[in-house]
């Protein structure tokens, strides 16, 4: 096994002001697998070696990175994943977290979805059919598959059936067990990461704590107080050479600006500074450092951090959904100065990220697809603190027939159920303490609730109820849902429902309502009663008899799946706080719609779909030109040409065009939108034969996708054009 070089992490993790950091983070594109963050510097030779073996060595299929938790395996894998040589060599890429709890079908599904994203939902595909399709796909192309955090050799044995013996595919694998890579491929090339030395640990911590940015944005060093330096060098020894722990300690110390403040941190860590002679002692000291980062949070951030304990391991936590949970519980609130729940939530998460307690994974393709995650060691701290403070109770249900012990329900105000079919057992006894109930289904499973279930009546003071992917018997949501008059959050996303009761009108305090469930449904005209709503997602398919009056929903900030077939365009005029809108046009109301959209001065994200038969041509897409603050625009409307660039807001960042049938090349206009970060043209967006990217165009573009443009024959990129990150 070859040992990696020094891991000096995050050049840019200086202790900027919160405002500076927020501005920077809002502009950076981040994803957990798709990330350009420079977490590793000083290991260029190791990254080059790993990339070289993936691309140039035909004798191996697997490159593995091994080492203990928190040492930087995933971070190193990202650097290799994004290496130019790797990106150019392979036809497709998949990144899958495996972890301790997984099923082979889930791993296979994730690989297929990332390699073939255009093939839609495969959650109901038979496992054997999926295996065959994936095997054949990997036989026919050059693909890189990253399996992150494979724990045991047996785990590989469960996954390996989809991988042909010898083809163009390669695998990058990370594991705490160096034997996993050898087991997967006896000829594998293995790297074993090492811990940082005390000197390297202090150098990393010092970068995080003491570097500042000057007015030009350049990093500059700040003179280090001798007493602080002496204490800091001792404290980093408690981090056991793990970059994760060093980063967390650095994030904590960056909030302390005087010697007495440092002394208090030093005294808290002090008992762990001496006498550490075993691995257990080292782990205890590491967890003490991680715990101390939590203990030093202000109360509002503590609650925000603890809320993350609800989610299963490696769960991609959608930040907007998280903000709505927090708002429903009163943990975050909007302010009189115009600060919204989303603004406040982003402030909280970015502060936790600055302290290196979470990572924020911002999808550079879309403004709204933003997630956060925790390292598994930090998650252990989160779970421990949540249990210690009776913040929530987690039920990991291993089988569909498992039940929840009613006695345990009295311990906490919050319940999180991971998998199984245990929800009906909640109705065995009335519990007036529980305020939130979140259900997380695993992969393609569904919990089944009978129409007569008493579980709603048994939890009368619920404020948060997430029943995503729950299957209701007979498709009927029980009318007893209307008894939960204290609800602020209700999600029925991807639930199996065909009938909604009129008792929903009783839920007048709702802030968040997600009706994005499966199947056709009649929605009673009761949503107008929910005048506190901030977020509303309507069903994709509704019965023709559905007619909704929504003009009283004046506090809405997000409205999804609005259709002119079921509600009046004029209702939008009253929703002056809207930031995000997805809208289906089903009639000839384009003029009214255009003027209505022009009144939405806060609108930042617009998704517009034409469902008229026959489709109407919107010449130049004038229908959206009055939206003066747009940052993200998705259009699926017929328009012969794209509007001129000067008609759009200068900070438009993301454009997604499909089924537009544009006859004129849109690139000469798009490339002059100076702040564009992603452009997607697909499914007949352009029906011409030739596209040209000019020299100097797209100065900030990170992502360009051209797909299913059947008439396109020639794509010209003029010499001097800047590098596209992904194509």
From Swiss-Prot:
Induction: Repressed by silencing mediated by polycomb group (PcG) protein complex containing EMF1 and EMF2. Signal peptide: none annotated. Residues 44-336 form the NB-ARC domain. The keyword Repeat applies. Keywords: Leucine-rich repeat, Plant defense, Repeat. Belongs to the disease resistance NB-LRR family. RPP8/HRT subfamily. PANTHER family: DISEASE RESISTANCE PROTEIN RP (PTHR23155), DISEASE RESISTANCE RPP8-LIKE PROTEIN 3-RELATED (PTHR23155:SF1185). This is Putative inactive disease susceptibility protein LOV1. The lineage of its organism: Eukaryota, Viridiplantae, Streptophyta, Embryophyta, Tracheophyta.
């Amino acid at each position: 096994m070859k040992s990696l070089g020094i891991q000096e992490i995050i050049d840019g993790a200086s202790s900027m002001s919160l405002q500076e950091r927020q501005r920077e983070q809002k502009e950076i594109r981040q994803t957990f697998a798709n990330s350009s963050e420079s977490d590793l510097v000083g290991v260029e030779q190791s990254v080059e070696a790993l990339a070289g073996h993936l691309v140039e060595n035909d004798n191996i299929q697997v490159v593995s990175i091994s080492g203990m938790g928190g040492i930087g395996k995933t971070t190193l894998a990202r650097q290799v994943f994004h290496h130019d040589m790797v990106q150019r060599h392979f036809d497709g890429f998949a990144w899958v977290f495996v972890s301790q709890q997984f099923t082979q079908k889930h791993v296979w599904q994730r690989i297929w979805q990332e390699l073939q994203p255009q093939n839609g939902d495969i959650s109901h595909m038979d496992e054997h059919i999926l295996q065959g399709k994936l095997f054949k796909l990997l036989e026919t192309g050059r693909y890189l598959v990253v399996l992150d955090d494979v724990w045991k050799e047996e785990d590989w044995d469960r996954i390996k059936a989809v991988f042909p013996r010898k083809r163009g595919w390669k695998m990058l694998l990370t594991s705490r067990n160096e034997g996993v890579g050898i087991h997967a491929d006896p000829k594998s090339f293995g790297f074993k990461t090492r811990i940082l030395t005390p000197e390297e640990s202090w150098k990393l911590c010092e970068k995080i704590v003491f570097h500042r940015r000057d007015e030009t944005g350049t990093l500059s060093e700040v003179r280090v107080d001798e007493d602080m330096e002496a204490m800091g060098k001792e404290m980093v020894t408690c981090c056991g050479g793990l970059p994760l722990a060093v980063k967390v300690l650095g994030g904590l110390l960056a909030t302390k600006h005087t010697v007495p403040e440092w002394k208090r941190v030093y005294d808290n860590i002090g008992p762990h500074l001496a006498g550490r002679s075993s691995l257990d002692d080292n782990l205890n000291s590491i967890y003490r450092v991680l715990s101390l980062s939590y203990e030093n949070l202000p109360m509002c951030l503590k609650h925000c951090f603890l809320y993350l304990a609800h989610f299963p391991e490696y769960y991609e936590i959608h930040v907007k959904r998280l903000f709505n949970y927090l708002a429903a519980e009163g943990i975050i609130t909007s302010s009189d100065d115009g600060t919204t729940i989303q603004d406040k939530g982003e402030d909280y998460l970015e502060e936790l990220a600055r302290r290196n307690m979470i990572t924020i994974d911002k999808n550079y393709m879309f403004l709204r697809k933003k997630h956060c995650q925790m390292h598994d060691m930090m998650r252990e701290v989160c779970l421990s603190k949540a249990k210690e403070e009776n913040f929530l109770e987690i039920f990991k249900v291993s089988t569909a027939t498992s039940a929840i012990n009613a006695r345990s329900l009295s311990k906490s105000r919050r319940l999180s159920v991971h998998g199984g079919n245990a929800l009906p057992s909640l109705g065995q006894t009335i519990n007036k303490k529980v305020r939130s109930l979140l259900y997380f289904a695993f992969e393609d499973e569904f919990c089944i609730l009978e129409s007569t279930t008493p579980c709603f009546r048994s939890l009368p003071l619920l404020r948060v109820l997430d029943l995503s992917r729950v299957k209701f018997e007979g498709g009927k949501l029980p009318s007893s849902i209307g008894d939960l008059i204290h609800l602020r959050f209700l999600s029925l996303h991807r639930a199996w429902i065909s009938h909604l009761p009129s008792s929903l009108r009783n839920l007048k305090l709702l802030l968040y309502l997600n009706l994005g469930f499966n199947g056709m449904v009649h929605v009673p005209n009761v949503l107008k009663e929910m005048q506190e709503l901030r977020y509303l997602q309507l069903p994709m398919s509704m019965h023709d008899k559905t007619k909704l009056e929504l003009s009283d929903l004046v506090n809405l900030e997000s409205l999804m799946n609005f259709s002119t077939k079921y509600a009046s365009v004029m209702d939008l005029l009253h929703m002056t706080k809207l930031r995000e809108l997805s809208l289906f046009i089903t009639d000839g109301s384009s003029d009214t719609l255009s003027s209505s959209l022009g009144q939405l001065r806060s609108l930042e994200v617009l998704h517009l779909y034409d469902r008229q038969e026959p489709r109407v041509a919107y010449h130049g897409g004038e229908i959206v030109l009055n939206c003066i603050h747009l940052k993200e625009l998705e259009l699926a409307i017929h328009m012969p040409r794209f509007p001129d660039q000067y008609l759009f807001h200068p900070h438009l960042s993301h454009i997604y065009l499909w089924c537009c049938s544009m006859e004129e090349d849109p690139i000469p206009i798009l490339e002059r939108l100076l702040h564009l970060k992603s452009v997607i043209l697909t499914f007949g967006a352009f029906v011409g034969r030739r596209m040209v990217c000019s020299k100097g165009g797209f100065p900030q573009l990170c992502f360009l996708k051209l797909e299913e443009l059947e008439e396109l024959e020639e794509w010209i990129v003029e010499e001097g054009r800047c590098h596209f990150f992904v194509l």
